[in-house]
């Protein structure tokens, strides 16, 4: 699961996969801005065939948050 999420994040943000850990913050560590995060959420929704409501997306700040959300909701 983490590897699949990491690959999508790397593609969306144009960074190397080895820069991404479960603890990585999208904004602080990976340099994402709010538009990057919206696009990333959309890519993850498509890849994992789920919908992440805005209220939940706002709580997702790290890679681990995304992985946990997908595990609990797919």
From Swiss-Prot:
<dbReference type="InterPro" id="IPR009081">
    <property type="entry name" value="PP-bd_ACP"/>
</dbReference>
<dbReference type="Pfam" id="PF00550">
    <property type="entry name" value="PP-binding"/>
</dbReference>
<comment type="similarity">
    <text>Belongs to the acyl carrier protein (ACP) family.</text>
</comment>
<keyword id="KW-0597">Phosphoprotein</keyword>
<dbReference type="InterPro" id="IPR036736">
    <property type="entry name" value="ACP-like_sf"/>
</dbReference>
<dbReference type="GO" id="GO:0009245">
    <property type="term" value="P:lipid A biosynthetic process"/>
</dbReference>
<keyword id="KW-0275">Fatty acid biosynthesis</keyword>
<keyword id="KW-0276">Fatty acid metabolism</keyword>
<dbReference type="InterPro" id="IPR020806">
    <property type="entry name" value="PKS_PP-bd"/>
</dbReference>
<protein>
    <recommendedName>
        <fullName>Acyl carrier protein</fullName>
    </recommendedName>
</protein>
<dbReference type="GO" id="GO:0000035">
    <property type="term" value="F:acyl binding"/>
</dbReference>
<dbReference type="InterPro" id="IPR006162">
    <property type="entry name" value="Ppantetheine_attach_site"/>
</dbReference>
<keyword id="KW-0596">Phosphopantetheine</keyword>
<comment type="function">
    <text>Carrier of the growing fatty acid chain in fatty acid biosynthesis.</text>
</comment>
<feature type="modified residue" description="O-(pantetheine 4'-phosphoryl)serine">
    <location>
        <position position="34"/>
    </location>
</feature>
<keyword id="KW-0963">Cytoplasm</keyword>
<feature type="domain" description="Carrier">
    <location>
        <begin position="1"/>
        <end position="74"/>
    </location>
</feature>
<dbReference type="GO" id="GO:0000036">
    <property type="term" value="F:acyl carrier activity"/>
</dbReference>
<dbReference type="GO" id="GO:0005829">
    <property type="term" value="C:cytosol"/>
</dbReference>
<dbReference type="GO" id="GO:0016020">
    <property type="term" value="C:membrane"/>
</dbReference>
<keyword id="KW-0443">Lipid metabolism</keyword>
<comment type="pathway">
    <text>Lipid metabolism; fatty acid biosynthesis.</text>
</comment>
<dbReference type="InterPro" id="IPR003231">
    <property type="entry name" value="ACP"/>
</dbReference>
<keyword id="KW-0444">Lipid biosynthesis</keyword>
<dbReference type="GO" id="GO:0031177">
    <property type="term" value="F:phosphopantetheine binding"/>
</dbReference>
